[in-house]
Amino acid sequence: MKQAIIFLKLWMISLLVGGLISCQQETPVTSVIHIDAEGTIQTVNPDLYGITLEEINHAIDGGLYAEMIQNRSFEDGIPPLNCPYDARRRVITTPNGYDMPFMRLDSLPGWRPLSTNTWIYPDTKELLNEKNKRSLVVSIATSAQNGRGGVVAEGYNGLAIQQGETYQLSFYLKGASVLPKNLHIALEDSIGNRVLSDVFTVSTHYEWKKYRHTFTANATSNKAILTFSSDSSQTFWLDVVSLFPETWKGRPNGQRQDIMEAIAKLQPRFVRFPGGAFVEGYTAGTYPVWKETLGNIAERKHFWNVWGYGTTNGTGYHEYLQLCEDLGAEPIYV
C-alpha cells in the first residue's frame, strides 16, 4: 500500500514539473538568415553535370536503343551459368541461393505464330554461329481451309510506325528443303488483316543466308507487327531478325531520335555507362564484358541480366562511345 502511495506522489510531482516547464516563455529569436539569390559564392564545376545510362526496366533494349524487334536472336529463355532452373516453380537459383523468377525455357517473348497452322520453337541445333545459342524453327502446314501460315514479331508492345517513314530490315534465313520456297515479309496491322508496307518476297535456301530490305510504311500505327508468311507448307529457320527506324544522327545500329534529342537538350558534360547493378550481375555471364559487346550484332553475347530479362548488347561499348562523341560528352565507363 505504501509503495502505491509513493508511486502516486511521484507521478503527480512529475506532472506538476512538466506543466511548469511547458509554461515557460520561449527563447526569443536572435538570429536571422539572409539569402542572396543573385550572388555567387562558389561556382559549380560544369563537368559535374551529366547523366547515367543503365539497362534497367528496358531503358536500353526496348528504350534508347532503336532496335524494334524484341528477342531478335531468340536467346531469351536460356538460364544463366550456374543457375539451376526449377520448371515447376519457374525460378532459377543463383549461386548465392536466391530464387529469381524465370520464364519457361521454350518461351519466345515478342514472337507468336501467325495462325493455328503454324508451329514455332526455339532450336538449339540449327545455329547461325557458335556464339548464337538458339534460332527459331517455323513449321507451316497450309491447306485450303486454314490459309496462310507464318510467324509474327510483335516487338515491345507493338511496332510504332509512321506513314512515309522507312525501316531497315535484316535477318538470317535457312530453309529445310533444297527446293526453294517463297516467303513473304511485311509490316501489318496487329491482327494481320491489313498490310501497312510494301511486301518483301524471298526464296529460302538450304544454308543460312542474310537478307536486307528497306520498308516504307503506307500507314501510321502504334501496334504494327512484322510477319513472315507463306501460302505453302514449309519449314524454315530464322535468326537475328532486326528492324530499325531512322536513328539519331543516322548512326548504324544507333539510338532512337526522340529520346536522344531530349537527352541532347540536357547538354550533359559526361555520360556514365552502362549502369550500376547491371554491371555487377549475380553470377558469371550475367554482366557485360566490353569485348563481347563489339562487332557484328549476330555475334554479340546475349545474357540474362540482374533485372530479370535478356540483354542483346546491341548498344555496346562502341555505340556508347559514339553516343558520347555525338553529345560532346566525356565517357565514364564503369
Residue ranges and their predicted role:
Residues M1-V29:
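Bacterial Sec-dependent N-terminal signal peptides
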